[in-house]
Amino acid sequence: RHGCCKGPKGCSSRECRPQHCC
């Protein structure tokens, strides 16, 4: 799921962008 910070790497995830940070 792109733009989600709930991934394994959290906000460090490449798919997570600052503006989409949970």
UniProtKB/Swiss-Prot annotation:
Chain positions of site Important for activity: 14
State the compartments where it is located: Secreted
This protein's GO cellular component annotations are: extracellular region
Q: Which of the residues bear the PTM 4-hydroxyproline? A: 8, 18
Q: List the disulfide bonds.
A: 4-16, 5-21, 11-22
Effect of altering residue 14 to A/Y/Q? Answer: Important decrease of toxicity to both rNav1.4/SCN4A and rNav1.2/SCN2A
The primary site where this protein sits is secreted
Q: Which Pfam families match?
A: Mu-conotoxin
Keyword Aminoacyl-tRNA synthetase on this protein?
A: no
**Family, as annotated:** Belongs to the conotoxin M superfamily.
This protein's name:
Mu-conotoxin TIIIA
Gene source species = Conus tulipa (Fish-hunting cone snail)
